[in-house]
């Protein structure tokens, strides 16, 4: 839930107007909107490159994943792995745009560890893949933009670790 929604829900629950502090936080959120949209657009426009680079780095660091018997062995399974990386990259953009981790939690993190465990997928390899996504994506961003996006990647990595 965005800071705007949270503030309104809290104020309404207490049957009051938004406080000066809440209004200031909303103002800060709105002012940062252009930056958040720019970050998400940069990532979205470069997603194929980011995912490919992250996948290549992951497979170099974790050759067991693409070796016979590995979860990404073979063309179809490698494509599935890259699809999953793209999914996490997309979730990060949702977090960036909303300025909140809620979309990441609600859409893609709840139950993910159990799912990967049931599939026999090494969760640490998935987390490493997201680390590589972070590296590739933040290299395209500068300063505060990289820090902003990096925080959402870190949240996903933490949830997977």
Curated annotation (Swiss-Prot):
GO terms for cellular component: phycobilisome; plasma membrane-derived thylakoid membrane. InterPro entries: Globin-like_sf, Phycobilisome_asu/bsu, Phycobilisome_asu/bsu_sf. Its main location: membrane. Disulfide bonds: none annotated. Heterodimer of an alpha and a beta chain. This is Allophycocyanin alpha chain. The keyword DNA damage does not apply. (2R,3E)-phycocyanobilin binds at residue 81. CDD domains: APC_alpha (cd12125). It is found in: Cellular thylakoid membrane. The modification N4-methylasparagine is found at residue 71.
